[in-house]
Design a protein with these regions (language model features):
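Amphipathic alpha-helices that form helix-helix packing interfaces
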Residues: 2-9, 30, 37, 41-44, ...
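Secondary-structure edge/capping motif, primarily at the C-terminal ends of alpha-helices
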Residues: 9-20, 48, 112, 138, ...
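Short, solvent-exposed segments of well-ordered alpha helices
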Residues: 21-32, 92-99, 118, 122
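Active-site-adjacent bridging/hinge elements
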Residues: 5-15, 98-109
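Charge-enriched, short contiguous segments at helix-coil
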Residues: 109-139
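Short non-catalytic regulatory patches outside canonical folded cores
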Residues: 38-103, 110-114
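Charged alpha-helical initiation segments
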Residues: 1-31
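Polyanionic, low-complexity intrinsically disordered segments
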Residues: 139-189
């Protein structure tokens, strides 16, 4: 849903590094939504209870211990021949400030109108890419090598560089199961 909302902005502002600093109220809303979702998902990824009062310091320490290479992982946008590293530079010394998109989210959250220029295409793209990357890593942690990663819907925007997918979209998985059941019935006849 967040990816779809971001993609709808591309009807008006082309996804291009030349437009990285283009800001809008829609990007402010998206940055707030993605940031809130990312905050919640960090808790899930780290195994913290939803009611725990955790922050970026807690998330950063856990994630970098669990997946230190996250800072080098590239997110690709093949359709636009673009790539970026949303967690590049993330560190435990300044966890919130070392992620520009997170710092932007916090500043928009606390003073939207004074910081509207931070609500730009680049920060929204990086926040969305960071969420996608963390979700994919979480899926790979909970699925064994014999199980597919099964998100509700495959990303139409992102891919991960040097990532091994065990990916079957839900619709194809059910078709596969139906096909196997039909095949078994056919084999018995």
């Amino acid at each position: 849903m967040l990816e779809e909302k971001f993609k709808s902005t591309l009807n008006y502002i082309e996804l291009d590094w030349q437009n990285a600093r283009t800001f809008s109220n829609e990007y402010a809303l998206l940055l707030q939504s993605i940031g809130a979702e990312l905050d919640n998902f960090f808790k899930v990824y780290c195994g913290f209870a939803a009611e725990d009062r955790k922050n970026m310091n807690d998330y950063c320490t856990f994630v970098l211990n669990d997946y230190s290479d996250i800072v080098n992982q590239k997110v690709l946008i093949p359709e636009r021949n673009m790539e970026f590293q949303p967690y590049q530079g993330w560190n435990t010394a300044n966890p919130a400030q070392s992620l520009t998109f997170w710092d932007g989210f916090c500043r928009i959250k606390h003073s939207r109108y004074a910081n509207i220029q931070i609500a730009n295409q680049k920060n929204v793209l990086y926040a969305l890419g960071a969420l996608y990357l963390l979700e994919m890593k979480y899926l790979s942690k909970i699925a064994t090598s014999n199980e597919p990663d099964v998100p509700n819907k495959k990303s139409e925007l992102f891919e991960l560089d040097n990532w091994i997918y065990h990916f079957i979209p839900m619709g194809e998985m059910f078709a596969c199961i139906d096909g196997e059941i039909c095949q078994i019935i056919d084999d018995e006849n």
